[in-house]
């Protein structure tokens, strides 16, 4: 009974305990149980992957993890199968002869990350084919599936299973051609040298990572042993070489920009895609223009005619490594293009900014940022490539690289081309503002390329030569209708012209430049598709087709048919322009010592300038030579006012020939004995130029043949051309005169070329060159090219066209050029039998020489006997 009482008492007391205290005890118990369970939770693969590691993490659209010289990608599942642009940029280098900071070894390319079971595959995406037909599109997708370039094992899912983690190190620390540190624009590549390289993985490292909302980047330090081949061995053998490469992964929009179809009648960079049409048209090649995605921020205001800023302006960041004095001129070279965009309603469409000082997110090697980069290189060059979204042609990134030695080259240009008329440039170093204008010109030309404008070599070809000595005309138009032409400075202007107000330099922008920007970037609101834009774009070009200011002339490389599309020339008449140019060169040689002798004690400047005088003379002669057998070429659509081609008139061709032949009469000014007598000793340039001119004249026979075949009236035939040369060459012999040394050399050169063009006797074994070579120009002497390379580095054909300074063995072979969107045209000389003509000429010359063998001086007679011997040997 007592025990029962105690039990009931305890129970009653328990029932009377405070409910809040009881609740607290229950919570404590539950918390203890939860903690125990938490301790018991297993570590995930994701946790184990990074456990105990010193991990650096960068969060962007992909999260990057760096540790133990490895880089892991944490790729969200929602990013799988998305289009990503991958590009590689040189950030640092131990030797910029293999590539300069800021250069990219290849165009960025499209990739996708695709999951396959327990792996992630990196796939290369093809964007070169399309169809609007649903069924064809399905088959195209299965026929052009993205190729697997690399496979990675999935190491883990993140803890909420929204992303996969895999090791990308093997891809980013390897020798991949598309991600290489060896630039195709490098000095070594331009020399045509063979590069043997061995990648050294054990000496290569992951150096850094960055992540942003729409892009991530990885820096890889790559190390090689490099050997550079030279004749008979190696110039460099197993040299250590390292470069830091910045690899950018950019997430492209799911919906590409609406593309604009290109037109071959205007010089815009483009790429081609193949359309599989369903309307019975079969395959159709379409050309997609490259352009920035400029859209008005306020469409209503834009349509009212107000100036409107774009949603996303074009921004160029200027390298802080440039000499400080260049900075404002670089800004000017970029922002001068604002004028062209303002004409089509955009305000502040293109902006130049200095490298940010306190922005941790800014990275000039990140492909997201477009930059003007400085390269401390001996090369005298600048370039402005751009990189695109291949799905739409949208320009994603563009960078201008300016090589330091360009300032040397532009100073020589300015002096050479304008010193006779402009006293201010008669100095060994240009005044800062004059040099600044030269820098701004180079920058504006290269920025034009980044905006997608190609070279327009016909920019000055319709300007009357005399207009280039007219103050009113030159102040309005400068030297050309397009700064995308290679029309440098006003070499037409004569002493006294500047005082009259004649402009010495190109315009800031030309009429064609405004027109090209308008065609490429003006919004077409009324068109809902790219196809609907075509009639409007076509009209914009067709309505300008009768105005020569807006003519587009393609840059010609190996084959040069069109004399109006030649680098460095000015004006509509090469003969008259070159006459003015030659007078100015003679004026320079006559006065150079009085202008700069006190500042050029070691003759370095004057020696270099003399070489540039010879180079300039070769250019002027070549402009004239191009008229012989020349054909003006135009891309034409039905209804356009210009013809597709038009031959140079017989009168102009004969005028050009007479100019060149008359130049041969007196080239002694090139040796300028009074000027050069204190210079280091050198061989006679006049004699070398004699040979080059006659070689050039005779090399145009094939071009004359094509031109006469295409002429609609009064053709200048190859027979007439040879007859005109023959009359000039043998005129002193017919007159019974004593021959000068020049006349004897001319006759010997002519006879040698004539023999090479025949198939008789010893000529059967001769190399059939010269008289049957229709693509010749006045050859630049190899010693002159060598001196130029020593002074300016290798200046390639992309910067100087056919007047580049590459050695003959460095010249890259080009594919046959065709019309349309390609570089030029491919024409074959008509199969007109000419051997009998050459044979007849040899017989006629033999008769003339035999009849004149006893005339003239003893030297002249010995010369005739040698000619007779050579002819008889050829006719055996």
Where on the chain are the PLM-derived regions?
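Bacterial Sec-dependent N-terminal signal peptides
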Residues: 1-25
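The catalytic-center signature of Zn2+-dependent metalloproteases
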Residues: 354-375, 437-494
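Conserved catalytic/binding loops enriched for acidic/polar residues
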Residues: 460-876
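Stable alpha-helical elements in mature extracytoplasmic
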Residues: 326-333, 435, 439, 443, ...
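Auxiliary tRNA-acceptor-end handling modules of aminoacyl-tRNA synthetases
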Residues: 25-322, 355-410, 414-431, 435, ...
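Zn2+-dependent metallopeptidase catalytic core
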Residues: 80, 325-349
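Sec-exported extracytoplasmic/periplasmic mature domains
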Residues: 335-346, 448-449, 453, 489, ...
């Amino acid at each position: 009974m007592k025990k029962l009482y105690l039990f009931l008492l305890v129970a009653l007391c328990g029932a009377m305990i405070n409910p809040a205290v009881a609740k607290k005890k229950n919570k404590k118990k539950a918390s203890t149980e939860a903690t125990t369970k938490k301790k018991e939770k297993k570590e995930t693969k994701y946790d184990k992957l990074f456990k105990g590691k010193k991990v650096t993490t960068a969060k962007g659209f992909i999260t990057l993890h760096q540790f133990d010289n490895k880089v892991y990608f944490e790729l969200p599942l929602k990013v799988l199968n998305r289009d990503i642009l991958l590009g590689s940029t040189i950030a640092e280098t131990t030797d910029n002869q293999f590539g300069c900071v800021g250069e990219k070894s290849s165009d960025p390319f499209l990739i996708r990350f695709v999951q396959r079971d327990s792996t992630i595959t990196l796939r290369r995406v093809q964007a070169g084919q399309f169809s609007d037909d649903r069924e064809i599109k399905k088959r195209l997708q299965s026929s052009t599936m993205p190729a697997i370039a690399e496979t990675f094992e999935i190491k883990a899912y993140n803890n909420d299973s929204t992303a996969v983690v895999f090791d990308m190190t093997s891809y980013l620390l390897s020798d991949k051609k598309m991600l290489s540190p060896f630039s195709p624009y490098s000095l070594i590549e331009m020399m045509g040298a063979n590069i043997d390289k061995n990648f050294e993985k054990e000496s290569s490292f992951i150096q850094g990572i960055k992540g942003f909302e729409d892009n991530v980047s990885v820096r890889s330090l790559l190390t090689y042993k490099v050997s550079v081949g030279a004749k008979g061995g190696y110039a460099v053998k197993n040299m250590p070489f390292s470069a830091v490469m910045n690899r950018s992964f950019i997430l492209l929009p799911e919906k590409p920009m609406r593309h604009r179809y290109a037109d071959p009648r205007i010089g815009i960079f483009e790429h081609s895609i193949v359309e599989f049409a369903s309307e019975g048209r079969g395959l159709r090649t379409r050309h997609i223009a490259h352009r920035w995605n400029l859209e008005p921020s306020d469409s209503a205001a834009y349509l009212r005619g107000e100036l409107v800023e774009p949603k996303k302006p074009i921004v160029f960041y200027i390298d802080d490594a440039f000499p400080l004095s260049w900075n404002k001129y670089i800004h000017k070279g970029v922002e001068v293009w604002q004028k062209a965009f303002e004409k089509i309603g955009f305000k502040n469409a293109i902006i130049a900014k200095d490298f940010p000082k306190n922005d941790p997110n800014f990275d000039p090697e990140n492909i997201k940022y477009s930059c003007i980069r400085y390269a401390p290189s001996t090369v005298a060059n600048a370039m402005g490539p751009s990189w695109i979204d291949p799905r739409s042609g949208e320009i994603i990134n563009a960078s201008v690289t300016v090589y330091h030695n360009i300032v040397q080259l532009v100073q020589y240009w300015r002096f050479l081309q304008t010193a006779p008329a402009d006293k201010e440039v008669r100095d060994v170093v240009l005044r800062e503002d004059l040099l600044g204008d030269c820098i701004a010109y180079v920058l504006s030309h290269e920025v034009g390329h980044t905006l997608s404008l190609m070279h327009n070599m016909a920019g000055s070809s319709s300007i009357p030569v005399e207009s280039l000595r007219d103050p009113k005309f030159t102040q309005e138009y400068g030297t050309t209708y397009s700064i995308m032409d290679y029309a440098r400075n006003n070499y037409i202007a004569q002493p006294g012209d500047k005082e009259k107000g004649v402009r010495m330099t190109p315009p800031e922008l030309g009429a064609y430049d405004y027109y090209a920007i308008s065609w490429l970037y003006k919004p077409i609101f009324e068109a809902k598709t790219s196809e609907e834009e075509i009639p409007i774009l076509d009209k914009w070009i067709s309505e300008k087709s009768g105005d020569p200011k807006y003519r587009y002339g393609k840059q010609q490389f190996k084959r040069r048919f069109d004399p109006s599309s030649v680098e460095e020339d000015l004006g509509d008449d090469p003969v008259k322009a070159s006459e003015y140019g030659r007078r100015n060169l003679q004026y320079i040689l006559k006065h150079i010592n009085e202008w700069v002798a006190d500042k050029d004690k070691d003759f370095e400047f004057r020696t270099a300038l003399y070489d540039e005088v010879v180079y300039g003379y070769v250019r002027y002669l070549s402009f004239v030579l191009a008229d012989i057998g020349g054909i003006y070429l135009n891309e034409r659509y039905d209804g356009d006012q210009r013809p597709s081609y038009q031959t140079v008139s017989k009168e102009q061709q004969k005028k050009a020939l007479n100019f060149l032949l008359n130049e041969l009469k007196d080239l002694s000014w090139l040796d300028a004995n009074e000027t050069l007598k204190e210079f280091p000793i050198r061989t006679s340039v006049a004699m070398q130029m004699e040979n080059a001119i006659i070689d050039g004249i005779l090399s145009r026979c094939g071009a004359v043949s094509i031109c006469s075949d295409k002429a609609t009236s009064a053709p200048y035939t190859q027979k007439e051309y040879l007859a005109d040369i023959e009359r000039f060459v043998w005129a002193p012999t017919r007159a019974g005169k004593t021959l000068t040394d020049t006349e004897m050399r001319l006759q010997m050169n002519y006879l040698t070329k004539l023999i090479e063009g025949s198939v008789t006797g010893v000529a059967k074994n001769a190399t059939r060159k010269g008289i049957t070579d229709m693509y010749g120009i006045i050859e630049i002497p190899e010693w002159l090219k060598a001196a130029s390379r020593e002074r300016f580095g290798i200046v390639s054909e992309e910067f100087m066209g056919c007047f580049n300074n590459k050695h003959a063995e460095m010249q890259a072979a080009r594919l046959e050029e065709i019309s349309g969107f390609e570089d030029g045209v491919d024409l074959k000389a008509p199969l007109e039998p000419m051997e009998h003509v050459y044979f007849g000429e040899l017989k006629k010359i033999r008769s003339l020489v035999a009849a004149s063998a006893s005339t003239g001086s003893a030297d002249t007679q010995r010369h005739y006997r040698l000619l007779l011997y050579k002819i008889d040997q050829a006719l055996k």
